[in-house]
Amino acid sequence: MESTLSLTIRSQWLERHDDEHKIRRDDHRSPFQRDRARILHSAAFRRLQAKTQVHGNSLEDFHRTRLTHSLEAAQLGTGIVAQIKKKQPEYRDLLPTDSLIDALCLAHDIGHPPYGHGGEVALNYMMRDHGGFEGNAQTFRIVTQLEPYTEHFGMNLSRRTLLGLIKYPAFISQTRAASQPAPVSHQRQIKAKQWSPAKGIYDCDKALFDWVLAPLSETDKQQLNAMRDCPHDALSHRKTRYKSLDCSIMELADDIAYGVHDLEDAIVLGLVTRSQWQEGAASQLADCGDPWFEKHISSIGEMLFSGQHHQRKDAIGGMVNALLTSIDVKPVDGEFESPLLAFNAYLDIGMEKALSILKHFVSQYVIQIPQVQIVEYKGQQIIMDLFEALSADPQRLLPLPTRHRWELAETDTSKMRVIADYISSMTDGHAQRLHQQLFSSHH
């Protein structure tokens, strides 16, 4: 059944929204090689080099940016696919090509606004009555509409690539909490936790989302839209339950890059100490249920904090390899007709626990610490100030192409969306410079 399904589906998943007739001589590339090239050459991708992954206050240029993070995720993604092909050859025809998984990993962060989570919270607050703001929803919007590779359809990527980029296949109106906190009297008072965005696709992008899902049966569409258990209170967002096989591989690559490579950054930047590692991660990894971690955890700690670059690299490489090689493709716990949805890639249970310990450690000791949060808070204020100014007098302050889009937008909500699109596309430095131009008497 699976093989016939994959054969009947295949050609539709290669289609593009706009059927192109490009003037290209002897172009032998596959659709996914083209998709990868479009992403790689896009302005949105290049801007990732000026968006920081972990906001420390180090003077060194060693730290990872969102661009280097995406390159590492892509390397991990192709590594995951290669080892599944070896271990489970029966899934060879279903697995993404190297170009496809590469494309997904390279593109997965391009919707992230300046100043990371701080920027996301700021834009979500400012857009609270206009459909919200969320990084993954913005990624979908950039690749399907905003990146000017085509006139109307963004990068005009193939359908399977777009499906792979959709981590949360539901509309934000469906995942958003039943009620939202009261708006604050002054934006300095906003609490980031209360305004973290619901995950999903913007409701205004429904036509494009529907186009991506068009090859699926009605039952598959409904099932893909399913939520996890109901949230415990009216202020908690709902979470989607399913995603495509390609997306599950991309997400694992992203998580490993975050949990392991961002840990390396933190050690080098001096954000974490050996005793914090021992208490916050090593002690739990020692009994996470995975024999590799249980056996090697003490030598990993030695190497990570040895002060020797090559030893630290060896430890990081060992952890990455242990995680990669414990990933398998399995049927999902839901009835899907399309093989792209019926299977996902999973870490085995011990390694899943290990990765969640590492991610929690990075979050607690690297992301949530005051020196990082101060930079995020400042970024949050910069973004809200910019939004307030630009939305107060758009025809005066927006750059001409953006102003033109704003004038063409027919409703208040779509006008606000144009402003959110503009601000979210900025790099950290661009946002800071514009803020100085608008508000600093010293500029």
Curated annotation (Swiss-Prot):
- Which residues does UniProt assign to the signal peptide? none
Q: Which SMART domains match?
A: HDc (SM00471)
Gene Ontology molecular function, alphabetical: dGTPase activity
User: Quick check: keyword Nucleotidyltransferase in the entry?
Assistant: no
Q: Which UniProt keywords apply?
A: Hydrolase
So what family is this one in? Answer: Belongs to the dGTPase family. Type 2 subfamily.
Name of protein: Deoxyguanosinetriphosphate triphosphohydrolase-like protein
List the top taxonomic levels of the source.
Bacteria, Pseudomonadati, Pseudomonadota, Gammaproteobacteria, Vibrionales
